[in-house]
Swiss-Prot record:
Keyword Hydrolase included in the entry's annotation: yes
InterPro entries linked to this entry: Acylphosphatase, Acylphosphatase-like_dom, Acylphosphatase-like_dom_sf, Acylphosphatase_CS
Root EC class: hydrolase
EC number of this enzyme: 3.6.1.7
Purpose: Its physiological role is not yet clear.
Name used for this protein in its record: Acylphosphatase-2
Residue positions where N-acetylserine is found in the record: S2
Reaction equations catalysed: an acyl phosphate + H2O = a carboxylate + phosphate + H(+)
Record organism: Gallus gallus
């Protein structure tokens, strides 16, 4: 299957948790901004364990770009030690209409 076919026909969903210095550094705001730029949907929130967690859905190539951003970039003041992805699957439709911060 060509990359073009995969990009246009396949929707993905993935859960994530980001570890490191990711709270109190505008991580959620930058995550929401990046998601909107890429055109993916889902959510982000702080956890009581000091991590940031959430879910991303969208075309496979856009979800992969967001995974890369969550693993390597983050907000300017953040320090990402590691990012754990789970429950990655192909979906038939999006569960969200936008990207939001949860509290």
């Amino acid at each position: 299957m060509s990359a073009l076919t995969k990009a246009s026909g396949s929707l993905k969903s993935v859960d994530y948790e980001v570890f490191g210095r990711v709270q109190g550094v505008c991580f959620r705001m930058y995550t929401e901004e990046e998601a909107r730029k890429l055109g993916v949907v889902g959510w982000v929130k702080n956890t009581s364990q000091g991590t940031v967690t959430g879910q991303v859905q969208g075309p496979e190539d856009k979800v992969n770009a967001m995974k890369s951003w969550l693993s390597k970039v983050g907000s300017p003041s953040s320090r990402i030690d590691r990012t754990k992805f789970s429950n990655e699957k192909e979906i038939s439709k999006l569960d969200f209409s936008g990207f939001s911060t949860r509290y």
